Every structure is written in structure tokens, then in C-alpha cells.
């Protein structure tokens, strides 16, 4: 099981929106050097809705190849079509990802039984370990804890990224889930509490900007060092908040560009960060000790 701080890595783009693979390779090196515990590529923060299938597959391939075993790579491979999700999962397995992150189908609003059958079908078709991704704020459909626990009985469904931010739901899963079922939060603001309560890690937006601090905070939380967690997280709270002052990944891509790690390219319908929001994010970065 991968524990700790897994970065939901941004997808570097040139100003014209074309993908910047050299910068992606540099970002991978940056995260290896900073102690990040894993990389999730082509997820929400990686702008998965606006990359085409060929680009999606190439981003997975490039990340796995350049990581070269130095850091685990989890491939974003979900979708609202079960058949297409299976195709992406199959490619991720062939490319050498250690697992796939599969989002709850969006827009078509399946029932709990539909969600169960969707994920079961992917797991039966592709052996690659599957991490469920529940983010009802984006998908509308909400994978219930009961359905999650049904899915946890399937051998290669190995965990969940719960981006609800609900500590009540997290505690219920921590209490009822199998001990080898990985529990990740997708909510940076509650990540410290989530891990201290028994979660295994976070799939983090903040880790794009403060990877060392997120790694250290998660390590302290996993060790039960609450005072150390409080100290580190106190510096990061502004980032947890202000990296969502506009729709993710608009603020975090601006922040990573401000650090000089990528260009500021982003694809429509997402637009560049407003001037007022830039001031907020820059202040949060400085308070977190980011060198900008």
C-alpha cells in the first residue's frame, strides 16, 4: 500500500495549450527530490477533461517511463463510459502504472447499483489495481460508503480517494473498511485530521506547490505525531484554502508557474487566474514558506 502524500500532478502546457513533456519530466524529478510519496497523473488537477485519448495515454506513458521506478505512478483512468474507462485502464496497465484512479461516472447520474456494476466491470476486465474516486461536488453522483464497502470485496479494488471532505464519512470508512483497503482523502484542508484518525494518505493539490511540507506532514500524521502535524499544517492552511479560490486547477497551475516550474498554459473552458486571486495565492505561498 502506498501511504503519505501523493501529488495530483498538474499537466504542463505551453501558452498555446499544447502539452509540454519536457516540463512534465522536470516536475517528476522535482517531486522525487522533494520526497513526494506518489504521483497521480491525468486526474482532475491534470485537466483530464480537456486532453484527448491519445494525449491521455501519452501522459501516462511519459510519467511511468520517466519515473522509472523512483516513485509510484497511479494513472487517472476513469470516465462516464464504462467501455472507455476499461480502455484507459488497459492502457495504464500496459504502460506500467502501479494502479488506476477511477472517478465516479459524471453527468449520466447512475444509481448505486449502476456505480457498483461500473467499477466491478472495470475490475473484472483489467487486473490493474483500482482506486475508487468519489468527488460528488464534480460528478453529482455520490458513491455511498455502503457501495464502497461492497466494492472493497472485489480483490483488485484496493482503495478509495474520498474528496467529500466529510470527517464523519471518513470515520465510518476507517471503522468499517478492510484493514488493507487504502483510504486516501482528496481534500487538503481535512487531510491532517483524516490521516491522524486512521486514513492512509492524501491525493493532494497542495503537494504541487509545497511537496516537502506535505510529505513531512503526512509522515508525522501516520506516526501519530499530532503536535508536529499541527505545526506543519498551520503553515499550509492558506494554500489548502486559496488553491481553490477559483476552480481547480486554475490557481495551482498559476502557482506552479510562479515557481518557475512550468509555463502558464491552461485549456479552455478554464481561464487564467484573475489578478485578485493571484494576490491571494501568492500571499498563501509566502506564508507557507514557498520560495517565490
Swiss-Prot record:
Matching Pfam families: DHDPS
Q: In which pathway does it act?
A: Amino-acid biosynthesis; L-lysine biosynthesis via DAP pathway; (S)-tetrahydrodipicolinate from L-aspartate: step 3/4
Question: What is catalyzed by this enzyme?
Answer: L-aspartate 4-semialdehyde + pyruvate = (2S,4S)-4-hydroxy-2,3,4,5-tetrahydrodipicolinate + H2O + H(+)
Give the main EC class.
Answer: lyase
GO MF annotation: an example: 4-hydroxy-tetrahydrodipicolinate synthase activity
CDD domains assigned: DHDPS
Which UniProt keywords are given for this protein, alphabetically ordered? Amino-acid biosynthesis, Cytoplasm, Diaminopimelate biosynthesis, Lyase, Lysine biosynthesis, Schiff base
Cytoplasm in keyword set: yes
Q: What does this protein do?
A: Catalyzes the condensation of (S)-aspartate-beta-semialdehyde [(S)-ASA] and pyruvate to 4-hydroxy-tetrahydrodipicolinate (HTPA).
Indicate the quaternary assembly. Answer: Homotetramer; dimer of dimers.
What is the protein's given name? 4-hydroxy-tetrahydrodipicolinate synthase
Amino acid at each position: 500500500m502506498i501511504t503519505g502524500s501523493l501529488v495530483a500532478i498538474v499537466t504542463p502546457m505551453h501558452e498555446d495549450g499544447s502539452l509540454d513533456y519536457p516540463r512534465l519530466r522536470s516536475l517528476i524529478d522535482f517531486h522525487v527530490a522533494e520526497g513526494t510519496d506518489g504521483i497521480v497523473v491525468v486526474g482532475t488537477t491534470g485537466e483530464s477533461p480537456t486532453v484527448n485519448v491519445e494525449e491521455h495515454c501519452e501522459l501516462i506513458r511519459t510519467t511511468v517511463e520517466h519515473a522509472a521506478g523512483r516513485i509510484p505512478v497511479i494513472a487517472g483512468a476513469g470516465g462516464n463510459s464504462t467501455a472507455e474507462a476499461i480502455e484507459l485502464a488497459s492502457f495504464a496497465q500496459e504502460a506500467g502504472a502501479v494502479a488506476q484512479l477511477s472517478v465516479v461516472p459524471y453527468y449520466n447520474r447512475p444509481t448505486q447499483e449502476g456505480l457498483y456494476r461500473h467499477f466491478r466491470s472495470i475490475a473484472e476486465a483489467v487486473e490493474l489495481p483500482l482506486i475508487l474516486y468519489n468527488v460528488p461536488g464534480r460528478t453529482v453522483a455520490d458513491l455511498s460508503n455502503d457501495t464502497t464497502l461492497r466494492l472493497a470485496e472485489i480483490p483488485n479494488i484496493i482503495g478509495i480517494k474520498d474528496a467529500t471532505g466529510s470527517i464523519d464519512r471518513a470515520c465510518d470508512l476507517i471503522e468499517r473498511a478492510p484493514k488493507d483497503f487504502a483510504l486516501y482523502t482528496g481534500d487538503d484542508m481535512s487531510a491532517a485530521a483524516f490521516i491522524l484518525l486512521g486514513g492512509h494518505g492524501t491525493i493532494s493539490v497542495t503537494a504541487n506547490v509545497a511537496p516537502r511540507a506535505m510529505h513531512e506532514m503526512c509522515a508525522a500524521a501516520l506516526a501519530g505525531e499530532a503536535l508536529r502535524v499541527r505545526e506543519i499544517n498551520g503553515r499550509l492552511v492558506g494554500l489548502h484554502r486559496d488553491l481553490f479560490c477559483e476552480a481547480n486547477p486554475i490557481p495551482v497551475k498559476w502557482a506552479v508557474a510562479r515557481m518557475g516550474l512550468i509555463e502558464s498554459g491552461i485549456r479552455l473552458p478554464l481561464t487564467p487566474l484573475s489578478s485578485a486571486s493571484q494576490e491571494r495565492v501568492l500571499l498563501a505561498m509566502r506564508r507557507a514558506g514557498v520560495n517565490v
